[in-house]
Amino acid sequence: MTDLKVLHSPEIYLFNSEQRQFGANVLKDFLYYIKFTGKKGLINFSFSANEDGLHQNLSIKENYILDAVPSSLIKNSEDNFIHTSENLTNPHLKDLIARTNCIERLVKDLEREERKLVGIVKTILSNSEYIFMDSPDKFISPETLAIIKAALEYESSHNNRKVFLKAATKERWLDIVTHWISKDESGRFTKSKNQLLSKPNNQTSNVVELKKAS
């Protein structure tokens, strides 16, 4: 019998970073927004920083294992990363891993785009409910960015993960972002649907004002 996985409507949020109400600490904005909408308890997230945020003196593989591979898949201090990557269901994530070839290389020896990509892959690999990314399009070629976007869409629709983005160039994300997040001077958030993805006959309002959870 085939195991049919339930697909979810993607949730990919782009923060309007052009607004001065959003600070330089984008991670703080992401977390505050989630708390603002009523999320209780700990927030299970992975974060790809504007700068790569990697362990420079470790290899690509060691970075993946340290933060992304579950400890149950690491046996006797020897990683099982090849087995893990081969069994990934996200084909686009597999493609991104393949682009970080020669994973025994040290991060400090990588080119700028490679370092950025390793940080993005590590974030997607992590088993988290939320994916936070600060400028994931920065230093990334159009070809690679297309694969990153496909990987994020897959994670959101197949694995029910919510993706939050602050883009270096927001226009590069208009084809996959489902919602815009804005913030007024009082700190109130507004969530708006990306009308480019809305159905033409949809007559419902595209703007939802979010009140702070009590």
Q: Where do the language-model regions lie?
A:
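ABC ATPase nucleotide-binding domain signature region
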Residues: 6-75
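Conserved catalytic loops of ABC-family nucleotide-binding domains
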Residues: 10, 41, 127, 141-173
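Short coil-to-helix "N-cap" segments within the ABC nucleotide-binding domain's helical subdomain
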Residues: 71-92
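Conserved ABC nucleotide-binding domain
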Residues: 86-112
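Hydrophobic anchor residue at the start of the ABC signature
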Residues: 119-120
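Catalytic Walker B motif of ABC-type/P-loop ATPase nucleotide-binding domains
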Residues: 131-136
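Conserved beta-strand-loop-alpha-helix hinge in the C-terminal portion
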Residues: 175-176, 183-214
